[in-house]
Amino acid sequence: MALRMIFMGTPEFSVPILNALFDAGHQIVAVYSQPPRPAGRRGLDLTKSPVHQQAEKLGLPVLTPLNFKAQDDRDAFAAHQADVAVVVAYGLLLPEAILTGTRLGCYNGHASLLPRWRGAAPIQRAIMAGDVQTGMMVMKMDKGLDTGPVALTRRVTITPDMTAGELHDALSQIGAEAMVEAMAKLEAGDLPLTAQPEDGVVYATKIDKAETRINFSKPATQVHNDIRGLSPFPGAWFEADINGKLERIKVLSSQMAEVTDTANVPGTVLDDALTIACGLGAVRLVRLQKAGGKPLDAAEFLRGTPIGAGTVFASAKAGT
């Protein structure tokens, strides 16, 4: 037997989970995704979401309502007569009519160990906070923001230099395995639910643009966590004076560095390997990217953009 299923998701993160459920033989009667968005320099082209594109490759019908305020959209959802809806990074809070619009309800794949990091940016926030462990949880959705009871948990270790991009990929794959297992148990009538604890609630708010500018006045551990938590998107950055022109440089990866001289101004370049003094300690910039350029390792970057020891990056003075 297989479940009659609706899948709801939008970004690349959700695609492996859609694929896994399809390969598991479930009858996916509809895929819901965010509407196509303007793309290109002039915004004249409309780009379908990664889930939308993959669903079409699989031959699945796709619906892209802006929201579910219209009764017609709610009726269309109910008309699928689905057993269950699987929701993974769809991008909308679902109204009661959708949460109760299938026989068994809506199950969500969320990229954190709830109740820590409820909300929009759990992967980035976990790394930026210096967490050493996170995970993927399958929960039954209710009206709250990631507050529903948990059905299944898979844990992942966050290594010291792991970026948000690397963690994203790991959780996406583990999430696919977890969701297939959860749906098999649900189909068998053996998927117990456990209420989330009331203590330990932390919200993963969206990343603000102001957070992406590196503040070297922070301790090196926090600078390092910010860099890897914002990599590859939206990217942590600083400004440097290159041949008399202030240029924005994105840092895609870094490492903690050992320093003996702790009296340097934060933001000071300490050597020819792009070791940068911080408020406490130092970080080494490993991979960088200029605006409009390609990502480069530090040595290759310095060959085209010489930055000497003693340079003080402008972002250290920004107070952000």
UniProtKB/Swiss-Prot annotation:
UniProt keyword Protein biosynthesis, yes or no: yes
PROSITE patterns: GART (PS00373)
Reaction(s) this enzyme catalyzes, per UniProt: L-methionyl-tRNA(fMet) + (6R)-10-formyltetrahydrofolate = N-formyl-L-methionyl-tRNA(fMet) + (6S)-5,6,7,8-tetrahydrofolate + H(+)
Pfam families reported for this sequence: Formyl_trans_C, Formyl_trans_N
Transmembrane segments: none
Residues engaged in binding (6S)-5,6,7,8-tetrahydrofolate: 112-115
Gene3D superfamilies named in the record: 3.40.50.12230
Gene Ontology cellular component list: cytosol
Organism domain of life: Bacteria
Keywords, comma-separated and alphabetical: Protein biosynthesis, Transferase
Molecular function in Gene Ontology: methionyl-tRNA formyltransferase activity
Top-level class of the enzyme under EC nomenclature: transferase
CDD domains (alphabetical): FMT_core_Met-tRNA-FMT_N, Met_tRNA_FMT_C
E.C. number(s) listed in UniProt: 2.1.2.9
Family: Belongs to the Fmt family.
Function: Attaches a formyl group to the free amino group of methionyl-tRNA(fMet). The formyl group appears to play a dual role in the initiator identity of N-formylmethionyl-tRNA by promoting its recognition by IF2 and preventing the misappropriation of this tRNA by the elongation apparatus.
Protein name: Methionyl-tRNA formyltransferase
